[in-house]
Amino acid sequence: METGLDTNARKNRSGEITETLVARIFNNTGIHYREQVSSKEFPAIADVLGVDQKVFDFVISTDAKTYLIEVNFYSGGGSKLNEVARSYTDLAPKINGVKGFEFVWITDGIGWNSARNKLQEAFAAIPSIFNLTTIISFIDQVKKS
């Protein structure tokens, strides 16, 4: 039992560390954001999600667009990566179909080496996928909008 709990604790820590790193990047580049924002704050998003309401890791609002952002990190492979990719592949078109909103996925980690095909499939459905190296291009996009 303890082993399983330790594994989950490690997974949660890597996700929290990545969120902290992304927040630091946003702070250092002058990006204003909110953390842990419910989809219920945006009636049009709540409508398209229906019962599948979500809490986004970050939300960035500009004059032109509101970016709803999910962040994660995978240090190992497994079914979780495939499930998250599938889930976000379903979620992104719903959000992106609402005028003024865009779904953004920031993900990284060597775990993706074993799930490259799922990540490639996700790229086809989610225009805004970034990692910790390419996040600067997202920041540039935000600053221009």
Model-derived segments and their meaning:
Residues 1-5, 66-71:
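Glycine-rich, often proline-containing surface loops adjacent to acidic residues and nearby aromatics
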Residues 54-68:
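Active-site beta-strand-loop-beta-strand hairpin of nuclease catalytic cores
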Residues 51-56, 90:
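Alpha-helical scaffolding within the catalytic cores
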Residues 106-145:
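Domain-level recognition of nuclease-like catalytic cores that cleave nucleotide substrates
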Residues 72-117, 121:
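Catalytic cores of nucleic-acid endonucleases
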Residues 1-27:
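Interdomain/boundary linker segments immediately adjacent to catalytic/signaling cores
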Residues 8, 28-50:
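A short acidic/basic microdomain associated with nuclease active sites
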Residues 23-35, 62-65:
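Secondary-structure boundary elements
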